[in-house]
C-alpha cells in the first residue's frame, strides 16, 4: 500500500431535505443498502486506495456515527500509527460566529494536519455513495499538475476533492481573511487563483442530499447492474460486523426482487423492497417499493407501498401506509404507526 494520501471526511453538513432521517443521527450514519451506513462507502474507498490515516469531522448528532465506526477495526484502521481519528468541535456550536464551515472545524484540530506525513489530502463528505479508486484520481492530479482536483459524475460534483496537504493548510490559515468556509467555497468563488481540474468518475454514484434521492438510490440498488458497479469484489465495502442468524421464511412468505438482510422473519409478501437486519413481516402483510430499517416490526395484514420505516419502529396490524417515489411516507425511528395513511 502507498501512504501518499490522508483522508478527511467532512461530516459537518446538515441538509434539511433529509430531516426526517437525521433527527437522531448524522447524515453519515444514515442506514443504506440493507446493512451499511452512508459513510461506509467513502471510508471503504479510502481504505481500498491505500489511505491509512482518516480524520472525521462531525458536527450534529454524532453518537450513532461513533458507535458505528468504533476503533476503525472493521476498516483496518485500528493502528498504532495513523488510523481513524474522530474530531468533534463542540465549542464551535456556541462560538457566536455567523457562519461556521468545515475550515473552522479543521482549524480546531490543525495539529492533525501539521503532523501528517502524507503529501496529499482527499476531502469528501459522508453521504456520497460510490466505490472510487482515489489512487487513479491522484495519478491524474499529478499528471495534470493541478492545485485541486474535483471529482465529478455526469456533470455533477460528488463533493470530493484532492489537493496537497500544504495547500490545504494554507487555505485553513487564510479562510477568515478571504471569506471562504469550506473547499466548496474555494472551488466556486476562488478558482481563478488556483488550477482546478476535474476527474470524471464513471462508476455508479449518488449524492444522498434529500429523502427523495435516498429512496431513489435505494431502489436503484435492486438493479443487478447498479449493484455490481457499486459492490466490487476487488474493492469491497466494509461495515460494522454484526452476527445475525439467516433469514427465516414462513410458509406464506413470498419475496420478489428485494434485498433482504440477515435475521429477518418473513411471513408475508415483500416485493421490490429493501429490508435491513432483524425485520419481522407479519402474516398476510404486503410490502412493496419500501425501505424497512433494522429491527422494525410490520404487523399482520399491513399494506405498505412507497414507505421508509426507520430503525426500531413498529407498524400495528392492519395498517395501510402509502407514499410515492417522489414523496415516500416516513415512519420515524422508534415510533409506533397505527393509522391508515395514503398520499
From Swiss-Prot:
- Any one GO molecular function term: glucose-1-phosphate adenylyltransferase activity
Q: In its keyword annotation, does this UniProt entry include Kinase?
A: no
List, in alphabetical order, the GO biological process terms annotated in this UniProt record.
Answer: glycogen biosynthetic process
Pfam families per UniProt: Hexapep_GlmU, NTP_transferase
User: Which keywords accompany this UniProt record?
Assistant: Glycogen biosynthesis
For this protein, the record's InterPro entries field holds: ADP-Glc_PPase, GlmU/GlgC-like_hexapep, NTP_transferase_dom, Nucleotide-diphossugar_trans, Trimer_LpxA-like_sf
**Which function does this protein serve?**
Required for the synthesis of glycogen.
The entry's family comment says: Belongs to the bacterial/plant glucose-1-phosphate adenylyltransferase family.
Q: What name does the UniProt record give this protein? A: Glycogen biosynthesis protein GlgD
Give the source species. Geobacillus stearothermophilus (Bacillus stearothermophilus)
Point out the gene that encodes the protein: glgD
